[in-house]
């Protein structure tokens, strides 16, 4: 018996030693061995996984690129981050590398949603959007009246509520009126869902402990179930919105588009269609109130285009406002940096001067590329004028702009987001003075979408005289 035990232990020890040797060989002699990065990243993805779970990677990666004086980083044995714009363009446009395998279950959803994001369809959503913005303005009016003509508004959460209502009103069967109720229950559940998703992506076994997810995000799950049940119980003609497109896809192919897939897609829509847009608008306001001269230029353009307080601000009237568009582009460049553009090499390729082998996850790091001083003069400064013409010898080129990803896999909802951002900002600065509340933290955390570490961002709001 002891002999058999000795043999088994010997086999196990040999296997452990074999695997250790393979790890060492891959770390020091493999194709990625010359790519700069933290020492531990040669052997394990654990340090990077911890950053993702904590949501701090948004803040720590930039300094790592500076520390190693490189435009490519090895942050796990088979994963690299790429920060130079030509290589990013090669990854997502020229070579159009396939998505990382972890996104396999989300394949083909673009085809389902295509009609739901066509320009004609989006134009038809304007009355629903405007109705939500009317409620937003009523909230501001009420708060200012309570404060004697001035109010401090938590724009991070208020705009999050607004974007949530817009998404539900236009795409999911009806608004939940969070803008007026300020009920944080669903938003807290959504935040927990995003954190849980980050944790599950690094500790996959948690996906098989269903009671954990059900307990933490029960409010979110109940909301999705309510949306589905309500629509399926309707009789007569139903709206041809995104919800119906998803349900129709399930009817056409219940195997590929299963009941579980319906729920996953709805949750994805809620996140992508509300949290990303609201944070983009909040960041734009943050930059404007911290740069009052730029804010004055925007107000001047809005006043010129809409001289009367009764002028209606619409999709068509805002799409060609040059300074408004420049403000949004610049705010997105500085603060909206997608961190889920992972691609996968299916053959050897050269990125940032290094040979990258097949079966490597390559992740474009847009934040560093969009603040590269070689491309963007005064790279970390808020300069909307760079989008209006030459600035300090350089012209802003949209091929270096990645806030909506790029190539064949760019963000399908970007035109929805552009319409929403233009209307919110246009209507807000048309009727209200917005001002800086000093002493606030700008530090953020990221779990799929970003949020302020302090949990809020306050802006002073005051009705404009004559408006």
Specify the residue positions occupied by each region the protein language model found:
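Cytochrome P450 I-helix active-site segment
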Residues: 40, 130, 149, 185-189, ...
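Cytochrome P450 heme-thiolate monooxygenase catalytic core
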Residues: 99-108, 124-281
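Cytochrome P450 heme-binding "Cys pocket" and the immediately downstream C-terminal segment
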Residues: 176, 292-294, 414-452
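N-terminal membrane-proximal hinge/A-helix region immediately C-terminal to the signal-anchor transmembrane segment
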Residues: 2-108, 123, 127-142, 162, ...
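C-terminal helix/juxtamembrane-tail motif
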Residues: 1-4, 452-467
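Conserved, non-catalytic sequence blocks in retroelement Pol enzymes and Pol-derived host proteins
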Residues: 32-36, 53-55, 119-123, 233-236, ...
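Conserved cytochrome P450 K-helix/beta-meander segment immediately N-terminal to the heme-binding cysteine loop
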Residues: 364-392
